[in-house]
Amino acid sequence: MLNHECTNNNNNPDPVYLKVAIIEPILLACIDGSSFSEIDRCVQRVIPSSELVQREYIFYLSNSSFISYNGIEKKYFIEPSGLELLEVIYVQAERRIVEYNDLTLKIE
């Protein structure tokens, strides 16, 4: 499990756990900027998930400053902390302590 010391901004005291298998394609899609539909296609290639789940993940990634939204371009972009998170994901995946599909990110 990846721990991220970030306060989620919805005043919910409970931590949120996000699957890395969904986070990674979202972050990768945002490197060059992507609309929601482009992100959806990238995620669906890796793991089937509903639009609602993807919107929830985007919400938490945005609130935690891993990605940002540009309203003029209507695209999501990765932030420096999102690039750092990708690096952490790859290091954890290389260590193979936990199966990739079981890796989660804890947002507090």
Predicted features along the sequence, with ranges:
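Short helix-to-turn junction characteristic of helix-turn-helix DNA-binding domains
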Residues: 26-34
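Short alpha-helical segments that sit at the start of domains
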Residues: 2-27
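A short, conserved structural fragment
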Residues: 62-73
